[in-house]
Amino acid sequence: MEVLRPQLIRIDGRNYRKNPVQEQTYQHEEDEEDFYQGSMECADEPCDAYEVEQTPQGFRSTLRAPSLLYNLIHLNTSNDCGFQKITLDCQNIYTWKSRHIVGKRGDTRKKIEMETKTSISIPKPGQDGEIVITGQHRNGVISARTRIDVLLDTFRRKQPFTHFLAFFLNEVEVQEGFLRFQEEVLAKCSMDHGVDSSIFQNPKKLHLTIGMLVLLSEEEIQQTCEMLQQCKEEFINDISGGKPLEVEMAGIEYMNDDPGMVDVLYAKVHMKDGSNRLQELVDRVLERFQASGLIVKEWNSVKLHATVMNTLFRKDPNAEGRYNLYTAEGKYIFKERESFDGRNILKSFALLPRLEYNDAISAHCNLCLPGSSDSPASASQVAGITGVSDAYSQSLPGKS
């Protein structure tokens, strides 16, 4: 075959290159059992990530996940273009109407059980407990465990954010300065495309976001609070020297590349003394939560900023990150934004009036609900770290 001129096959208007395949023939067909039996010799390899217990009946592995995730997955029996289509069926974000973890009529669970030669036991809907995987062969149990973990992780990533970690930047003086900024922008630039009062942040909600979380159970919320306390004890106090960190918001910048089509305008946040302590602190908190799996790793460093204008606020004043990308039925929403022309704002307000914030943010890393405006003064103390415990029940599966 000529490598530079391969045979082309046209399918549905697309050209595909047909590459040669060197087929090998064997005297004897391999028995599927041979693969499982051979893998048992590697039972003690250190690369195994899962704990598998050997029992008189074979092998056993367990995993625990929020009961909400047990009820997510439905396998649509249609098969379009050779790809299985996964759909969600739910009543609302936190109360899902479905059968078991792996599919309508148990199709997905049966498929995993058949292909891995295992048996999978799952708690009934609404009940907490462990998923138990048993099988005659260790390799099969590990394979089933891996596939279930992938399914759970995939659907967790698709859930709307329930909480976020942030430092509040809503001191009275800062709110007043922000309102003056808003008034001046509307007075000078309200005729510019897309600029109106609806896209400004609520001054009570000014904050510096560290990361977004999906917490689906009381246990995960408690784990988050405990991890915040560990961060405080292990490095936050050392970085801050046990004293409040004095920061300021000065200057504005936009997220995208075209100042004429802006979706997010933010105020830059930095230490008043010019040090890097705030950046170090938030990066280490982010790193700790990413390592635990509570925050999906998308960035290696936190961008220190406080959003002051966001076009998502036009339709939802409580918009925060990915929070609004899914409906209550779990369907993805394409949110079409109406960008605004930020050129005059950037030119007229290149130096946002310096807004000093002198609160003890080193001791008040907050676990918040999207849309909440609780301040450190009104939020309750959770293990020495400010949290929003009274609102927790509103964010849990099955709670109304």
Swiss-Prot record:
GO terms for biological process: DNA alkylation repair; regulation of DNA-templated transcription. PROSITE patterns: KH_TYPE_1. The keyword Lipid metabolism does not apply. InterPro entries: AKAP7-like_phosphoesterase, ASCC1, Cyclic_Pdiesterase, KH-I_ASCC1, KH_dom_type_1, KH_dom_type_1_sf. Ubiquitous. One of its GO terms (molecular function) is RNA binding. Residues 86-148 form the KH domain. Changing N318S: Found in patients with Barrett esophagus. Signal peptide: none annotated. Identified in the ASCC complex that contains ASCC1, ASCC2 and ASCC3. Interacts directly with ASCC3. The ASCC complex interacts with ALKBH3. Part of the ASC-1 complex, that contains TRIP4, ASCC1, ASCC2 and ASCC3. Interacts with CSRP1. Interacts with ZCCHC4. Plays a role in DNA damage repair as component of the ASCC complex. Part of the ASC-1 complex that enhances NF-kappa-B, SRF and AP1 transactivation. In cells responding to gastrin-activated paracrine signals, it is involved in the induction of SERPINB2 expression by gastrin. May also play a role in the development of neuromuscular junction. It is linked to Barrett esophagus: A condition characterized by a metaplastic change in which normal esophageal squamous epithelium is replaced by a columnar and intestinal-type epithelium. Patients with Barrett esophagus have an increased risk of esophageal adenocarcinoma. The main cause of Barrett esophagus is gastroesophageal reflux. The retrograde movement of acid and bile salts from the stomach into the esophagus causes prolonged injury to the esophageal epithelium and induces chronic esophagitis, which in turn is believed to trigger the pathologic changes. Spinal muscular atrophy with congenital bone fractures 2: An autosomal recessive neuromuscular disorder characterized by prenatal-onset spinal muscular atrophy, multiple congenital contractures consistent with arthrogryposis multiplex congenita, respiratory distress, and congenital bone fractures. This is Activating signal cointegrator 1 complex subunit 1.
